[in-house]
């Protein structure tokens, strides 16, 4: 009986260089779940290291334009880089949240947010300048404007008192009557002129006089104005109907003017 010895022969190695190349060549094994394990050997500074890498190849169907875009040649800092984003050159600096409020639904959302913000303000805060309840008088953005207006009122009061002895009480009575029919408008947008203000308040009643306080140097509105009606009833209706209405990017505040005496 003749015995046959089955010997699995290894690849023929003709030189030591081929032996080193075969030994250092990566060996790839694929598991049942599609994960491939690659084992390779590398030598650094005379020290031999074993490197094991696991990866999985996934085939994904994408639109043709996306596939063509991946073939574009990279340029600039990404020149010569392989396909796909690179950590060194591709990153998101910061996320920018945008809110579009051009349609009616967006305006309603903005109004609801403003109402919630107004509800959060405490009733203890009150500004004696603009009568607002969301800040103190020291933090009023129109504090300088009101102070200038108060100084102008004080100067006018002094002039009127000095003139009483010469002109009698007729001018003073006329001025008091005018103050009774005058509304003070604050939070006035700089884009609003006298004609627009007259058009808005003229729907309530007959307007006799409109005065918009302006800066002496720049000529820009200071943010408040005075509207005088022919009757006090029209002034009262203007305060009731036009107070807290939206005008451009501001909310108008309409109230009785402070008496000058």
Swiss-Prot record:
Q: What does the function comment of this entry state?
A: RNA-binding component of the eukaryotic translation initiation factor 3 (eIF-3) complex, which is involved in protein synthesis of a specialized repertoire of mRNAs and, together with other initiation factors, stimulates binding of mRNA and methionyl-tRNAi to the 40S ribosome. The eIF-3 complex specifically targets and initiates translation of a subset of mRNAs involved in cell proliferation. This subunit can bind 18S rRNA.
List the source organism: Caenorhabditis briggsae
Q: Which residues form the RRM domain?
A: 181-259
Q: What are the alphabetically sorted keywords of the record?
A: Cytoplasm, Initiation factor, Protein biosynthesis, RNA-binding
Domain of life from the UniProt record: Eukaryota
Q: Which cysteines are joined by disulfide bonds?
A: none
Among the GO molecular function terms of this UniProt record, one is: RNA binding
Its family remark reads: Belongs to the eIF-3 subunit G family.
Report which residue ranges the record marks as coiled coil. none
Where is this gene product found?
Cytoplasm
Renumbered to this chain, region (Disordered) spans 156-180
Instruction: Quote the HAMAP family the UniProt record gives.
Output: eIF3g
Task: State which gene encodes it.
Answer: eif-3.G.1
**Compositional bias ranges of the Basic and acidic residues kind:** 168-180
What lineage, starting at the top, does this entry show? Eukaryota, Metazoa, Ecdysozoa, Nematoda, Chromadorea
Name used for this protein in its record: Eukaryotic translation initiation factor 3 subunit G
**Subunit and interaction comment:** Component of the eukaryotic translation initiation factor 3 (eIF-3) complex.
Q: Return one Gene Ontology term, BP aspect.
A: formation of cytoplasmic translation initiation complex
Q: Give the CC-aspect GO terms.
A: eukaryotic 43S preinitiation complex; eukaryotic 48S preinitiation complex; eukaryotic translation initiation factor 3 complex
